[in-house]
Amino acid sequence: ASDVYKRQVKHTAKCIADLIEEGYQVAITHSNAPQLGMIHTAMNEFAKAHKDYTPAPMSVCSAMSQGYIGYDLQNGIREELLNRGIYRTVSTVLTQVIVDPYDEAFYTPTKVLGRYMNAQEANEERKKGNYVIEEPGKGFRRVVSAPNPVKIVELDAVKALLDANQVVIAAGGGGIPVLEQDNHLRGASAVIEKDLAAGKLAEGIDAEMLIILTNVEKVCINLGQKDEEPLGEITTEQAKTYMEEGHFGIYNMLPKFRASVDFVEECEGRSAYITSFLSLIHI
């Protein structure tokens, strides 16, 4: 792992330990985009070099990324808690999330994945039935679908750990997308939007608060314009209006607002925050 990644884990662990020290019970999710891309590329390159190996499917790559990041996070948080004299078990739950096979997202893939490819490599990907887009001047990249999360398979395990007063990391990278086929769960060639999965997890464990951490203290409307305005406390109705007006784009802030609105509206007395790590202490 790079030094930057290690510093990020250490910083994240401190911020989460602050919340736990304040008396909060936490379930933690995380993104996995860089790691998933790296694992997927490595698996494909290995399969090219060793023809008797089959490339690992997307679902397996997602599982690997949960183990990779979960391992570092749980040890970072555990160490930080022990340094403060707090004795709590921290564990990562390998989490599968059921998606709808008829989700419209499967017909319009949007999430780029892995390294840039040349035209020949892109053609090989297309022959496998994968979607590829061209980024002018850079090359080609694979794109995968981002279906909505329907149900978290291991939810009861997460709840049991929380009931035992443990710190839980779950639904990392949005969870491993799976399709229900009778009693069988089949991995889907997709990624789940991590913010929506976080909201689904928060609903499932009946959390009082959903906190989505990003790199800005406050989200702005009219971003980059003269009338740019940072948002403070708003209602779900206001949030929906801003979403309809297109203030939050498609791929960045919009899923965070969708998850927040769904979570708050599903049950009375809930709140959601979209803010930075540094602003956690003000919540």
Residue ranges and their predicted role:
Residues A1-Y5, I283:
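Short, small-residue-biased leader/transition segments that mark boundaries at the very start
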Residues R7-A17, P57-G76, E80-N83, S145-D163, ...:
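Polyanion-binding loop/helix "lid" in catalytic or ligand-binding cores
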Residues H11-C15, L19, Y24-N32:
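Long, well-ordered hydrophobic secondary-structure segments characteristic of membrane-embedded
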Residues Q25-M38, T89-L94, V168-A171, L210-V216, ...:
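Short beta-strand segments at enzyme active-site cores
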Residues A33-A49, G224:
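Glycine-rich loop at the start of a catalytic domain that most often binds anionic cofactors/ligands
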Residues A33-G37, V99-P101, I176-V178, E217-I221, ...:
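Short, active-site-adjacent cap segments at secondary-structure transitions
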Residues N44-A47, P109-K111, G187, D227-L231:
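Short, hinge-like loop/turn segments at secondary-structure boundaries
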Residues F46-V168:
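Ligand-binding beta-strand-loop-alpha-helix segment within the catalytic cores
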